[in-house]
Amino acid sequence: MKSNRFILAALTFFTFIVFLSPFVYSQNVQDLINKGDNYLDVKYDNQKALDTFFEADKISPKNWEVYWRISRAYVYIAERMPGNSDAAKDAQLAVYQKALYYADQAVKLAPTEAVTYLRRAIANGRIALFKGIFSVGDVVNSVKKDCDKAIALGNGGNYVQALAYYLLARTNAEVSKKWKPARSLLGLGWADLDVAITDYKKAIDLYPNFRMFYFDLGYAYMRKDDYTDARDMFNKVIASPKKDENDDSLVISSKAILEKIKDK
């Protein structure tokens, strides 16, 4: 009788553990994701964020939610690496390429999620800027393609969609600096500053009060000699709340630009 009770209790406990384990497993991964996000977005500790996401990867391998975050952390780390020597530049590029690898894996795992294409576009965009956008036309075209795909999917929330429009705008703005006949030979004839301005505005509509969006739109207006709208954007940079690690530097730059163009 006691033996039967023991067996029944053991089976009940085992069943409880079997059903509870996936919940605990899922909660642990989500807790690590939340912790990593906090390191990135609040504490601005990119290395600790990366380490935390790799902890999540050990628990949940091949998880697209983890992979795109690893990519994001690598981009942030690379952005802040010194590039004052050839060896330093090589090391920086290697980190950007790691970011691209994990973003690409995220796309393969979740091809219907806009954020995966956005993170791949961001990693490729950084590589293109690093190498020189007119030396890697195919990479620039892939940035545009991934932004278009993220926008077409339309998911991920306003911030993801705003970033997709912003990156598409910035790509148009940067590429359009080169003489169109010359860049057309590289397959980059599509770039247009007016399109960039339109897409910057879409990004702002989706996610207002973000300093980076206002700053780049202000710069685009300056290229059009529209100093009235440019001043408005730079003043909005100053008035907007801090949401990103680089926001303080944008305020400093905006104040300097406003002083420079005050009589224009």
Where are these regions (language model features)?
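Terminal, low-structured helical/coil segments at or just beyond the last alpha-helical repeat
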Residues: V29-Q30, Y159-A162, A182, K236-K264
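TPR alpha-solenoid repeat register
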Residues: V66, T116, V160-A164, F213, ...
